[in-house]
Amino acid sequence: MYLQLLKSLNRLHPRAWDFVQLSRMDRPIGIYLLLWPTLSAVWIAGNGSPTLANVLIFGLGVVLMRAAGCCINDFADRKVDGHVKRTADRPLASGRVRPREALALFAMLVGVSFLLVLCTNSRTVWLSFGAVALAFCYPFMKRYTYYPQVVLGAAYSWGIPMAFTAAGGELPASAWLLYIANLLWTVGYDTYYAMVDRDDDLKIGVKSTAILFGDADRNIILTLQLLSLGCLLLAGSRFDLGGWFHLGLLGAAACFAWEYWSTRKLDRESCFKAFLHNHWAGLLVFIGVVLDYAFR
């Protein structure tokens, strides 16, 4: 039904679907992966009772900034996507959208996101510039470093400190444990994603942690995921989170174990499924946070 609604936009404009695909609104997995840790931070920062305004601001902000990130990503990769089987039909690579149109959509999405941030406070507004900088820089990093996933992790985690400053203006040191946990988790699942394209990336000179980790890829991903859980466990103790939160962490650990087992053959399909599966890990942690506050 969601996709049918998006496709109906073509009735308004014949090229609407091209821009839906450019912003990946037809593939909401990236929204979920960004949304759950951000909302977890909103709940913790609000001590279990976040304001409706903050929930809406950060929820909509996630959707808009993820879409903006996809636009600038495809702009940066427009000359290489055509050489990768999975991305050859993207709107920019196939010529259905012009580069300046992608930049215009990126600017528009960032502008609307900034209007949302203006509804918070000055410290959160200043932090938002870091979010835009990271979102813009990430897609270009894969040309120069084997650690673009770390930059993505920094970008995908930036909503966490913003959630705390929006809730009360203060940024406790413990909030950075949540930030580090999410960064490690993001590097892990995006490495699974990069493993899908590893053979193509090697041919065209695109760098990634999947290439850097080589044969140790799955073991390093699992290590990153366990370190992420450790940071969450420590953060939970600092924020007085208890049993329900710990159950959420156990659920996430089960997800990580399944991903490790399911990718043992290193085929593209299983690596892509492992990437998608991380949505459930993030959701379980978020549910654990919400229930822990709800049943106090």
UniProtKB/Swiss-Prot annotation:
UniProt keyword tRNA processing present: no
Catalytic reaction annotation: all-trans-octaprenyl diphosphate + 4-hydroxybenzoate = 4-hydroxy-3-(all-trans-octaprenyl)benzoate + diphosphate
Annotated coiled-coil segments of the chain: none
Gene3D superfamilies (UniProt xref): UbiA prenyltransferase
Say which family it is in. Answer: Belongs to the UbiA prenyltransferase family.
Among HAMAP family, the record links this protein to: UbiA (MF_01635)
Species annotation: Pseudomonas putida (strain GB-1)
CDD domains according to UniProt: PT_UbiA_COQ2 (cd13959)
The UniProt entry lists membrane topology as:
Multi-pass membrane protein
Listed A to Z, the keywords are: Cell inner membrane, Cell membrane, Magnesium, Membrane, Transferase, Transmembrane, Transmembrane helix, Ubiquinone biosynthesis
GO cellular component terms attached to this protein's record: plasma membrane
User: Its biological function?
Assistant: Catalyzes the prenylation of para-hydroxybenzoate (PHB) with an all-trans polyprenyl group. Mediates the second step in the final reaction sequence of ubiquinone-8 (UQ-8) biosynthesis, which is the condensation of the polyisoprenoid side chain with PHB, generating the first membrane-bound Q intermediate 3-octaprenyl-4-hydroxybenzoate.
Kindly list the biological process annotations in GO that this record carries: ubiquinone biosynthetic process
- Sample GO molecular function, one term: 4-hydroxybenzoate polyprenyltransferase activity
For this entry, the protein name equals 4-hydroxybenzoate octaprenyltransferase
Q: What is its main location?
A: membrane
What gene is this protein a product of? ubiA
> EC number(s)?
2.5.1.39
Membrane-crossing residues? 28-48, 52-72, 102-122, 145-167, 174-196, 219-239, 241-261, 275-295
Q: Which Pfam family, any one, appears in the UniProt record?
A: UbiA
Q: Which cofactor does it need?
A: Mg(2+)
What subcellular locations does the record give?
Cell inner membrane
Pathway noted in the entry: Cofactor biosynthesis; ubiquinone biosynthesis
Q: Which domain of life is it from?
A: Bacteria
Instruction: Output the InterPro entries linked to this UniProt entry.
Output: HB_polyprenyltransferase-like, Prenyltransferase, UbiA_prenyltransferase, UbiA_sf
Key word Lipid metabolism present: no
